């Protein structure tokens, strides 16, 4: 029996990025392929006709490319960390129905997926935890989840499309707490400047009647802005769209490569990498 999801529910918010990853896989198979997303779409009882109609537009297809590159970039960072920390904890912050942990599984790492309880309930039904894996129902800002993570072999945290919905002080508090709790760990996530965040969250902000867009997390110069948060942070970043792949692929339109340059440049779309120092810089 298929898992039924009603429209205009919290569960529906999980379907949107899932459908995006499915379309990424179909349109750009040489760049990104999410077998789990493709399978889950077939197992969910939901009217995807509106999504299917929108998917024909050029800008929507560029949106799918954005999704593909974000997931591919973050997976690249996870795999890189696992090369030097094969027994590390791989932690998906705000996981939804994303299976990046599975895609990067090296056979020895430990996988953790964290999200709100109602989200984890859906995940448990559709993506039950496997071997060396744990689904944790918790608000990310409630740091009690720290105690659930076995970081004895290292800790690699990643968040895809999550921090745009956080206030800047919330991101700062969480990052600083993680740097203290997981020395030698690493956090990677996507970010963009204020103009881009306003465009991305336009509908959400309107529906939530939020007027102070400037309070939400945005980054222009990651190294300068985030290094000031803590002496334990080593900050670097790479372009979100072209920093890991030049997109010279037969499936990618030249116009999309142009838009990618605009995104990485004018919008400061980036993958931010925060390495947590093993010791406080002032002590080194």
Predicted ranges, named:
Residues 1-91, 95-138, 151-152:
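Rossmann-like AdoMet
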Residues 143-153:
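Short amphipathic alpha-helix with an adjacent loop that forms part of the alpha/beta core around
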Residues 157-158:
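A conserved beta-strand element that flanks and buttresses the S-adenosyl-L-methionine
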Residues 165-178:
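A short, conserved alpha-helix within the catalytic core of class I
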Residues 181-194:
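Conserved beta-strand signature within the Rossmann-like core of class I S-adenosyl-L-methionine
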Residues 198-213:
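Short, glycine-/aromatic-enriched active-site segment of Class I SAM-dependent methyltransferases
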Residues 213-240:
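Short alpha-helix
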Residues 232-258:
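Conserved catalytic loop of SAM-dependent methyltransferase domains
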